[in-house]
């Protein structure tokens, strides 16, 4: 039993290979791990944590983004949320911010929609890593 399952969290894991091609010629290939969790109790947070990119910077001109006050986090992670107060409270913890930044910085995405959490992590992960466990533990308190 995994550490997350021991906390009462339902875990689904899948693996995908993403390829890019130009004019029918494969130019790159990368593997990703897709995780889906159902938390043991309902939470109200709705947020997506993704890589800060040019498009996100344009969106920030028109819509305020949560800033954690941690320059490394704020420059790496774009936070989209419908629950800004709850999301800001989650980001008060330095270890949670650091874990999110590492996962997203490596090419991952985290989506939280109430008791449902979806992560896509770069690479092949057969077990939960410390950053995933820290993040989910922070969600359930």
Feature map (PLM): residue ranges:
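Charged, low-complexity intrinsically disordered regions
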Residues: 2-141
